[in-house]
Amino acid sequence: MTTKTGILLVNLGTPAAPTTAAVKAFLSQFLHDQRVVDLPRYLWCPLLHFIILPTRSPKVAKLYQQVWTEQGSPLMVISKQQRAALEQELKREGVEVPVELAMTYGSPSLDEGWQALKAKGVNRVILLPLYPQYSVSTTASVFDGWAKAMKKERNLPVVRLIRDYHAHPEYIQALAMSVRRHWEQHGQGEHLLMSFHGIPERYEREGDPYGHQCRRTAALLAEVLGLEASQWTASFQSRFGKEEWLKPYTDVTIAGLPATGIKRLDVICPAFAADCLETLEEIQVQNREIFMAAGGEQFEYIPALNSDQAHIRMMVSLICRELA
C-alpha cells in the first residue's frame, strides 16, 4: 500500500463565540481534562459545575468580547492562516502533503482533523502541537485526544508526534527576529520580560519538563539578542486556583519593575504560537494597566510569531526532519 503523509497542526482551542454559553461549553471541556486539572473527580467536578463554570463563564465571555474580531476568535483566525501558509510553504519546497487544523478542545476536534486527512487518503500523520515547550497539560493532552480519535479505527495510521521545539535554532531565531523588528519600529525598552503560561509547581516536581524548557528558551533568546542578565526576566502567567504555580509570576514581576527604575518595558510570550486571550487581553490589557499604575511609562507587547514567514519556515524544518 502506498504511504501518503498528512500534517495535523494542533492548538488548544477557542470558544465558538464570545458568549457565556459558548465559553461555558469550552471551559467545561477544557477543565474536565485530567491532564489540565488532576484533582480527584469527586472533589473537582462538583466545584467545577456548581461554582467555577457559573461564575467564571460570564466573566471570561466579557474578556473574549474585547479581543473578538469580525472574522472570529483571534486564535482561530491565526491558526487558519498558519495552516494555509504551511501547506503553501511545503509545496514551494516540493513537499505535496495536505495540512489540516485541529484543536484539543472545541472545533475542529482532533477527530475532525483526522477525518479530513483520511478523506484525502492519508495513512501516515505528523502531529505538530503548536506548543514549543512540552507540558503534560498541553502536548500530552494532544496525544490523549489523538488516541481517543483512533478508538474506532480498524487500520491505525502511522503517527509521529513532534514533542517540542523549545531549543530549535530556527524557533529561537524567529523569536529574535520578531523582537529586533519590534525594536526597530518602536525603540528598545529598558527590560525584556519573557512571559510563559504557567503550570502548578507540583507538576514540575513530579517530572514535567515545561518549566526547565521555558527557562532554556528564555536564556537562548537572551543570548541571541545579546542581553545581559539584568536586561531580561522569564516569568509565568495565567495562574488559576490556590496551588503555587511556577514563579516568578508575571503580574507580580511587572508590578515591581517600575520601583527598580524600569519605566519602559517590552513583553514577549514565547510559549504562544498564536495570539489569543492570554496575550491580547491578559498581557496587552491587564498587565499593561498593572505596569502603568505602578509607575511605568511605556509598555510594549511584542506579538506572537503567528503566521510570520520565519515561524512557518521553522515548522517546515520540523516537518521535513520527520519526513526524512
Curated annotation (Swiss-Prot):
SUPFAM superfamilies: Chelatase. It is found in: Cytoplasm. GO terms for cellular component: cytoplasm. Keywords: Cytoplasm, Heme biosynthesis, Iron, Lyase, Metal-binding, Porphyrin biosynthesis. The keyword Iron applies. Signal peptide: none annotated. Belongs to the ferrochelatase family. This is Ferrochelatase. It comes from Aeromonas hydrophila subsp. hydrophila (strain ATCC 7966 / DSM 30187 / BCRC 13018 / CCUG 14551 / JCM 1027 / KCTC 2358 / NCIMB 9240 / NCTC 8049).
